[in-house]
Amino acid sequence: MTQPITAPPQPELATAVPPAESKATNDEKSAFFTAADDAAIRPFEFHASDEELADLWRRIEATRWPDRETVADDTQGVQLATMQKLAAYWANEYDWRKCEAQLNALPNFITEIDGLDVHFIHVRSKHPNALPVIVTHGWPGSVVEQLKIIGPLTDPTAHGGSAADAFDVVIPSIPGYGFSARPTETGWNPPRIANAWVTLMKRLGYTRFVAQGGDWGALITEIMGAIAPPELIAIHTNMASTVPPEVFDALRADQGPPVGLGDDERWAYERLDLFFRHGIAYAQQMGQRPQTLYGIADSPVGLAAFFLDHDILSYRMIARAFDGVAEGVTRDDVLDNITVTWLTNTALSGARLYWEALPRTSPGFGIERTNARFFEPIGVKVPIAVSAFPDELNQAPRSWAERAYPKLIHYNRLPKGGHFAAFEQPGFLVDEMRAGFSSVR
């Protein structure tokens, strides 16, 4: 008689042993440990066991590969050759311990907000009068995305800036992502997360702060700007929600762009049209049936392929990295992010954020069933800075930004970069945050 298959237990998020006093070794199974449970803000470290890493390599090596795609390009999805190069590097050359050491060298913490343990990195600047900023990642992401910008933001004098550019940096893990707890109930949607971030910043003692984000982080940040708590003085986004209603009407009608669009606006329309026609499948799956994605929780290569297929330009950039042509994002960057998700078993809990955010009243599919609030103005009330990267899937022409944001304080179109700005072009993003928030310091 076969034994029933049961789900593995969730890793404990806390023990009574502070990191500095821990006796944990790489051979022990516990991956998470923090300080005393009754502390409001508890120190945190993450240590994957040797067994967990061996299991990861074993699963990669045991991948059952499909046939090659029947086309010569990526129109059928992530290409076999790319995934085999990624798997070979992941199993034979990639070193997770480097990323782990980099993460644990930073001040990491856990605090309970609204019944859920939330992880965050908190780095204070040595410079007086540093401006506090909360920076939020997106999907498929984790706090690993923002590691490159921490030093330049907190220590600007060592990175080409002045002391007046300094920030205190707070980088939380979205609930269900990375090192934050996985929600066990419904309701952890972007507005709830936005309110949690306000609570976090106030808990840290900040009575005046700014916020920044891309992807889900952009939406969460803009919702914070719409809620407009008195402590939030401005926000910055690298994926602005500016699409006018007549443009969405034209996309839904599938009758071409509205009459009278300028060159930048037409380009933005064409990028959105391309995305809704050929790039939105991942979001539709997660928005409607996230729990069906068991394969990405069981197969590391399956998880990696699903993550790579975010948008066409990002996929092609990542594919070139595994061909030896790094354009800001390296192979290790890509695998650091994927490995965080694998080791924390947060592939499905992260996917559920799309389900939480998706309107459940619309009977249609396609554009009607996607989370349009990623792209439509939501009534930001605080000053906002916008950075438009040319390879972002959702373009934000200046005319749309001026229309969407009555308190637009900064707008700039960058010469290069795409959806993962903090990963791809950290220097540009840091410069944009310095410039964008300069008028509110």
Residue ranges and their predicted role:
Residues 51-125, 129, 333, 342-345, ...:
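Non-catalytic accessory segments flanking enzyme active sites
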Residues 96-98, 161, 174-188, 222:
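Glycine-rich "HGGG/HGxG" loop immediately N-terminal to the catalytic nucleophile
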Residues 285-441:
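C-terminal subdomain of alpha/beta-hydrolase-fold enzymes, centered on the catalytic histidine
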Residues 152, 156-159, 207-256:
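Conserved hydrolase catalytic core segment
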Residues 191-209:
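Conserved acidic catalytic loop of the alpha/beta-hydrolase fold
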Residues 153-179:
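Conserved alpha/beta-hydrolase
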Residues 139-151:
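The serine-hydrolase catalytic nucleophile loop
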Residues 130-138:
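Short beta-strand element of the alpha/beta-hydrolase
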